[in-house]
Amino acid sequence: MSLLSVVFVALALSADCFAVSIGIACTHTDVKPRIMWRVAGTFGLFQAGMAVIGYYAGLSIADVISSFDHWVAFGLLTVIGGRMVYESVQGEDDQKLVRLDLTRGLGLLGVAIATSIDALAVGLTFSLSETNIGLAALLVGAVSLAVSYLGFKLGNRISHLASRWVGIAGGLILCLIGLKILAEHTLGWDILL
């Protein structure tokens, strides 16, 4: 695969990270750069790591993984997003709105796994096309990190809207990404974002 093709693949893989970063920034007031870099770095590491795992896994397990990866991503994103919507609707003030912290711990781990599952499949295609996995993983990780950080910057700019509605929107974004992944894998739809 050419270097330009790998860059385009990296941009496509980072779309979910971008949307999730916007959602997280919208549900947390004034996300600090340290947190942005931690989450963006985690997304970049998971994207690169999953691509490497997919590359080395090879075709022997491709059918097994592809039979359930979309369900895992859908389930994680829908549960996390649904909980964010529920907490935003139930919350009475800004202090109670964000109980599920997606910037660290299990919350961050869940969204990092869910947004990087597609990179596993892409890693398989890298092995088939004799792509340099070191360079490809570096590009996928770096692009995901940069795009995630930009998502945080954009999310911070719009997070000053009514926080209850922004929390609902952030949760719905996660749910929609889960539905997108499910539709792409089960219905064969090619959805851009």
Curated annotation (Swiss-Prot):
Disulfide bonds: none annotated. One of its GO terms (cellular component) is plasma membrane. The keyword Transmembrane applies. Keywords: Cell membrane, Ion transport, Manganese, Membrane, Transmembrane, Transmembrane helix, Transport. One of its GO terms (molecular function) is manganese ion transmembrane transporter activity. It is found in: Cell membrane. It comes from the Bacteria. It is a multi-pass membrane protein. The chain crosses the membrane at residues 6-26, 39-59, 61-81, 106-126, 132-152, 165-185. It holds the Pfam family Mntp. The keyword Membrane applies. Probably functions as a manganese efflux pump. Belongs to the MntP (TC 9.B.29) family. This is Putative manganese efflux pump MntP. It comes from Dehalococcoides mccartyi (strain ATCC BAA-2266 / KCTC 15142 / 195). The gene is mntP.
